[in-house]
Amino acid sequence: MNVQIQYVKFDADTKLVEFVEHKMDKLDRFVERAIGADVILKLDKDHELGNKVATINLHIPGDDLVAESRGKSFEEAVDLSIEALKRQIDKYKGRLEK
């Protein structure tokens, strides 16, 4: 799966990039038909809810699955987005089986 990672309003370190790539590799094993994914990591102004935002747009044939989560760290936000995508993938697989 081709994964494009974008950073908005900050420069990512190597550790964060490797973390995101590792998580996306795990997600790729979960869904067989994924074409690619766009991961957008950005800083937001809202510190109460968490100012780190991770948006993942997963491209699959005929559909796009999108999850956006906030956290106090980018790792937390990415984990929450991945979990949301896993739930969406389960629903998508259920629709395909009908």
Question: Where do the model's predicted regions map?
Answer:
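N-terminal, polar/charged subdomain of small-to-medium soluble alpha/beta proteins
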Residues: 1-98
